[in-house]
Amino acid sequence: IYLREGKGVVIVDTYFKEIDLGDKPVFDHYFSLRHYENSEFTFTNMFIWRYAFNLRFTIIEDCLCVIGKFGKDFHYFFPPIPGENSRVDIAVHNLIQYFKEHGYPVVMKGITHATREMLEEAVPGLFRYERDFNNDDYVYRTEDLIHLRGKKYHQKKNHINKFLKSYQYTYEPVGENNIEECIQAELEWMKNKDPIPGLEDEKVAVLEALRNFDALKLKGGALRIDGKIQAFSLGELINPEMAVIHIEKANTRYHGCYAMINQQFAEHCWKDVPYINREEDMGIP
C-alpha cells in the first residue's frame, strides 16, 4: 500500500518505543477488540521478530501503531489497530508525517480486506493498493492437515508414510520439561546450515519464542526419535476459530520429519479449532 500524492497531513512529534515482553498486555488488548486473522497481528509475531525488522510502536489517538524496517532502508508501517475510542484518520496522518519528516517513502504493509475497508472509511482514496504475494498467509482447515485426504495432500501423506516406516517416534507437548532440549536442538541444527540471508534472524526469533514460551502463552508439540527431540512446532490461538503456527523446525536428516510434526501438532493441539494459519506456504501447489 502506497500513499497517493496530493493529500494533506498534520504535523506531529511522534515517539516510537522498542517492543519488550512487558508490552504484551497492551498489544493483546488492541488485538482482542476485532477479529484478526493475519499472523502478523499477534504480539508473539511482533515480539520474536522485533530485532529482525526493527519493530517499534506507539499509541496515537487510541490506535496501536507499529513501524518497522526491512533490510537497510525499506521502512514501513502496519495499519493502525484501533481501540475503543480511536481516530484512525488522525493516526494515519501522523504516521505519514513521521515518514515524510524522516525522508522515508510512505509504505504500509500487512493489509487485509478488513483493514483496507477500515482505511477507506477513515481516509478514503488516500492510498493505492498492491498485492504482496511474498507475504501471503496460508490458511487451512484443521481437519485437512490432520487427515491429509485427497490429491492436494498426496505428497505430504507419502512423506509421512515413509517417515512411519523408517522411524520409531513419540509425540510430546512442549513445556518446561523439554524447552531446553528444543533450544539445544535448534542451535545444533543451525550449526550445520550454510549461511544465507535471514537465517540468523530466524534463529533469534525461534530462540526468543522458546525462551519466552510461558510468558507468550504459546502451545507447542515435539517429536522425539532415538531419545532426542528432532522436531518441534509452536503456535497460539489468534481468534476463537483459528490457530497460527509461529515456528516449525525439524531435523532434515529424518525424511518426512517436517510433514510429521505438522500433522501431529494439528491433531494433538488444534483438532477443536476449525482453521490453522501456517503463515507461509507448505509447498502445496
Task: Please provide the spans of the model-predicted regions.
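Short, Lys/Arg-enriched N-terminal segments with co-localized hydrophobic residues
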Residues: 1-11
